[in-house]
Structures are given as C-alpha cells and as structure tokens.
Amino acid sequence: MRTSDGGARLLDQIMKLALGTVQFGLDYGVTNQSGKVEESEIEDILDFAKSNGINILDTASGYGNSEQVLGGVGVDDYQIITKTTSLKHGVDEVIKGFYQSLKYLNQKSIDGLLIHDINEVNDKEFDDLFERLNELKQQGLVNKIGFSIYTPEQVNFLLENFDFDIIQLPFNVFDTRLVEGGQLQELKKKNIEIHARSVFLQGVLLDFDNLSSYFSTWRGRFDKYQEVVEKSGMSLLEYALNFALNTKGIDKVLVGVNSEQQLREIIQSAKKEGKSSAHPINDVNLLNPSLWRV
C-alpha cells in the first residue's frame, strides 16, 4: 500500500511519540485531578498506543509501582526505557536495582537505561557505576545507556566527560534553553538519541485557568501566549505538541496520560498541521517543576 507524503508525515509524527508511565505508579502533575491510573485503564492505553504505532515506554524504579504494573499487563511489544536507583547505597545496589527492574518488567533485556539523578556524577563511585552500566550494555542486557538531565550546564559536562547513547531532557515552548545554548545541536553531532520530556510542563501549558497562586508571577506571559495560540487556530494541546514534534534534532517526544481518551486527543493533535514557535521564559522557577512551591 502506497502512502502519500502527507500521510507519511502524519505517521512519522505519531511514531515520534513515546509514552511516559509515571502516572501508572504515582499521582503526578500539578493539573492531574484523577490520581494514579487504574490497571484496566492502563491496558486500554497500551493497546491503543500499540495500535497507533507508539512503541516506546519510559518508566523508572522511582515511579511507584509502574514497573510492576507494566510487567503485569505485558509489554513485550514495546521498547522499554527505565532509570537507575539511587547510588547512595553503592554501585552494587544500583546494579541489583537494574536486575530487579528486569524482573518487575518481565523482560530479559531493555532498550535503554538512564542515570536518574544527574547529581550522582559528583559521587566518588560514579565512574565505577558508569563502567558497570557499560558492562550491562556489552552483555546485551541494555541497548543504550545515558542520562536524564535538567539544565544546559549538565549537558555541557556530560558531553565533555562521557560517551553515551541517549539523553532525556526538558523541552517545551517556554523552555528552549538547550536550543538557544547549542546543546541540542552538539548532542546530534555525536548521534546521541534525544528524548524530550515536560513538553506540556506537567500540564501547565494545557490549562492556565486552574493553576495555583504560585504561577501568578507569570500570568501576563501566559495571557500573551494564549492570545498567540488562539490566533494560530490551534488548541493549547495542539500548539505545544506541534512545537516539540517539529523541532529538529528531537527523536522522541514523551507524553504522559491518565486515560485512553487523553492519548486519543494527543494522537489527534499530532496530526494537526500548523506552525508553532518558541515563547521562551528563562526563569528556572517556572521551568523546573522540582522548584515549584505548590
């Protein structure tokens, strides 16, 4: 069957999506009103994702019981990316944690393993840990190793000091620091696979009307942004998603959902043609959810 250029583009957009699973194990997101996702709903979400060409799941041992849930419902048809446990109890415990993740996920190997806490690079045992992760890769237990990061400075440090395969980083219409600083381009020069998370800024970019008073500092910027989105003819969801999907260099765009219906809306939005642009707000108190006082 032949596919038109337009149809191929839409398929590429959808296949660029990856499914985050933190909501499967934890209450997550400042706009999340429904809490942790029920297992029956998770099965529906995964079935719908698979039928629409989404084949990457992102999880972590720190996401509550999400690994156990995924292993229970069955994820053999997916490429799995998980993250390390804390290094504070030693390298051996991190490696044990990886094998526990394989057991929970009911997998013999996975696609990717990320260092979850980037600050651990300062630990005296980190070089040993990274060497052990490379050994897991050589043994065929994991295909790619890399990092989950928060700032451009962290990317600079990693590029100077480590050879790695994959990175997960924050990116959205408000947070384009890694484009402006050139880090995205440097990562691609080294053929490092780039996964963008926080494309909806934990839901902030989808609903400006029901935010806590913490976000009042940026109310004027939010209002101006909403005016731009309205003029574009796109919804808030379509605009934010379009921006991430169409940014050169980003290989996968992570989205998290609480229901099959939300995933349907995201996939439909990925098909929307339109032009969105960056609206940078260079304030880490907004861009880094770990700093939010909500």
PLM features per residue range, with description:
Residues 27-39, 83-92, 122:
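Active-site mouth loops of central-metabolism enzymes
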Residues 70-79, 99-108, 158-162, 186-189:
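Acidic (Asp/Glu)-rich catalytic clusters
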Residues 51-54, 107-110, 142, 164, ...:
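A structural motif
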Residues 103-121:
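Active-site groove signature of glycoside hydrolases
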Residues 77-90, 112-116:
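A short, structured active-site edge motif that brings together acidic residues
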